[in-house]
């Protein structure tokens, strides 16, 4: 790599002296890479980011291999997901709030998170109104929302300051209104659940939301923050060991739930979901950078959240509504790979990691 960088530098110098721009594919690639790394403040940042990302990828791959080997039983993803959503994720949220300073301005991110999950859902509901019910369920439940608690939270906590984790929690509080039950309830009302109509839809949505421990944690902590009630340091210290386990458990859960089983004509539906999510992410990122009233670091974290994978509940809700859960699992797995690549590229290209 060192020799290649030297060759790339010599190639650029030679072109500057001759005054002519000629193409040499391999050397041009190394020259571009050399320019990219020169934009980052110090090699230690690059090394630290890549090591942490490599650890996340290794855990996901280990989870995928373990799930396929049946060494943890038939449905290990369900067991690990219960551990994450019951213990590690709520404790991680509590620890994030207790370790950083909250500012009321961050509350703006709650409706923004809700809007970023709700708008794609509405568009999918309108565009897919002539599709078969199973396909419509698949599009509506998998085009919206982000897996922030199990992917973006450990990612941001590993690479950014504690204050950024609080901003993330505000955004996810809005996102969770759709992804912990709102999308499922609306889909049941619009397309049906496959198990008959939902009686008392308002009660169903409220019950679904408040039965989610991460959402309950967000709600309580936001209320405490608004009234300027500090979380006792004893509570922060108590939750720290459990919160530290969230990154490993969440990434392992993602690996266990990845399924690459669908093929053929169904891949077109996956491509539609991936393309639509990418278009919405690009549009929301542009709006964030242009209009969000925060510093550049907070805007950057929001952009990373907008490229987070599809919600881990998407395949489950798809199954409950009578859709193709395996296809949902495939699209979910691809968005995880996409999120790792894009989030890492954003961090490396800007060089802002703590």
List where the protein language model places each region:
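Extreme N-terminal basic, low-complexity initiation segments
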Residues: 1-7
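Short, low-complexity intrinsically disordered segments enriched in A/P/G/S/L with frequent Arg
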Residues: 1, 13-24
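Alpha-helical transmembrane segments of multi-pass small-molecule/ion transporters
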Residues: 9-11, 22-29, 33-354
């Amino acid at each position: 790599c060192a020799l290649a960088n030297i060759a790339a530098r010599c190639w650029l110098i030679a072109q500057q002296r001759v005054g002519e721009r000629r193409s040499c594919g391999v050397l041009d690639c190394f020259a571009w890479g050399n320019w990219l790394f020169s934009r980052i403040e110090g090699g230690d940042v690059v090394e630290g980011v890549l090591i942490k990302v490599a650890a996340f990828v290794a855990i996901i791959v280990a989870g995928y291999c373990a799930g396929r080997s049946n060494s943890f039983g038939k449905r290990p993803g369900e067991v690990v997901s219960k551990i994450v959503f019951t213990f590690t994720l709520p404790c991680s949220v509590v620890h994030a709030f207790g370790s950083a300073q909250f500012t009321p301005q961050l509350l703006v991110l709650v409706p923004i998170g809700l809007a970023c999950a709700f708008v794609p859902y509405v568009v999918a509901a309108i565009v897919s109104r002539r599709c078969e019910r199973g396909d419509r369920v698949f599009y509506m439940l998998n085009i919206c929302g982000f897996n922030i608690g199990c992917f973006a939270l450990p990612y941001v906590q590993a690479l950014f300051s504690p204050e950024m984790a609080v901003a993330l929690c505000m955004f996810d509080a809005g996102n969770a209104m759709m992804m912990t039950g709102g999308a499922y309830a609306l889909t049941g009302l619009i397309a049906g659940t496959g198990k008959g109509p939902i009686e008392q839809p308002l009660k169903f949505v409220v019950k679904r939301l408040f039965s989610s421990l991460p959402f309950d944690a967000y709600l309580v902590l936001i209320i405490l923050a608004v009234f300027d009630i500090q979380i006792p340091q004893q509570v922060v210290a108590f939750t720290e060991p459990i919160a530290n386990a969230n990154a490993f458990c969440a990434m392992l859960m993602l690996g266990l739930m990845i399924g690459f089983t669908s093929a053929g004509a169904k891949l077109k539906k996956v491509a539609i979901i991936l393309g639509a999510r990418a278009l919405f992410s690009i549009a929301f990122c542009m709006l964030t950078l242009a209009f969000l009233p925060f510093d550049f670091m907070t805007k950057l974290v929001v952009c990373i959240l907008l490229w987070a994978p599809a919600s881990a509940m998407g395949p489950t809700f798809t199954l409950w509504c009578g859709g193709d859960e395996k296809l949902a699992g495939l699209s979910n797995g691809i968005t995880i790979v996409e999120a790792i690549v894009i989030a890492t590229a954003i961090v490396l290209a800007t060089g802002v990691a703590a």
